[in-house]
């Protein structure tokens, strides 16, 4: 049984499962186990997780990679929010609520932005920052952290990272490792 943060430990079904010897896993433990043996790609951030995770899953699918993915919304063009693929990649929306993302340990982690959220879990902005720092440090050895250089809070986080963690910046600023320019919308996209 996978127990989400919304289900109390004293929930009758959880208690019955434990009494019957049925394993009960926290959502973070279960999702982390799904990434085992895969190239885990976790997307975290206060805003943009679903969009960014969807774009990565869609691109990998369009390239014929057949990734596994779990996203917080239905992906346009794939018509699903989850897929068990045969490819090497597993793309997951790395939700910070209740520190779910701490159980993931991806090969590639993305942080889109950070703005203090979920005060029930993170009473202070410093607590929120510390949680994202722990997520960033959970990247597997040899992995990479992709950070949005347009967000001051994310840039502040990068300063707290160990030098051994490879981080690559992206954004709209020319100082980023990768940046977009001359952006044109076609048909509203």
What name fits each language-model region?
Residues 5-149, 153-165:
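Phosphate-binding loop of NTP-binding sites
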Residues 63, 183-189:
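Short, intrinsically disordered, charge-balanced linker/junction segments flanking boundaries
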Residues 173-176, 188:
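Glycine-/charge-enriched secondary-structure boundary and capping motifs
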Residues 99, 172, 183-185:
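Short polar/acidic secondary-structure junctions
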């Amino acid at each position: 049984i996978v127990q989400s943060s919304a289900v109390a430990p004293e929930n009758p079904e959880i208690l019955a499962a434990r009494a019957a010897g049925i394993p009960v896993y926290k959502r973070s433990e279960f999702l982390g186990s799904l990434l085992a043996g895969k190239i885990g790609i976790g997307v975290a951030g206060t805003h943009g997780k679903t969009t960014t995770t969807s774009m990565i899953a869609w691109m990998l699918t369009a390239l014929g990679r057949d990734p596994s993915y779990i996203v917080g919304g239905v992906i346009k063009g794939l018509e699903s929010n989850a897929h068990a693929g045969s490819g090497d990649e597993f793309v997951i929306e790395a939700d910070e609520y209740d520190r779910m993302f701490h159980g993931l340990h991806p090969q590639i982690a993305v942080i889109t932005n950070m703005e203090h959220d979920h005060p029930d879990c993170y009473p202070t902005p410093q607590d929120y920052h510390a949680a994202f720092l722990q997520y960033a440090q959970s990247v597997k050895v040899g992995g990479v952290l992709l950070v949005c250089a347009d967000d001051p809070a994310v840039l502040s986080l990068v300063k707290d990272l160990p030098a051994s963690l490879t981080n690559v910046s992206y954004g709209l600023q020319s100082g980023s490792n990768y940046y977009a320019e001359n952006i044109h919308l076609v048909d509203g996209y």
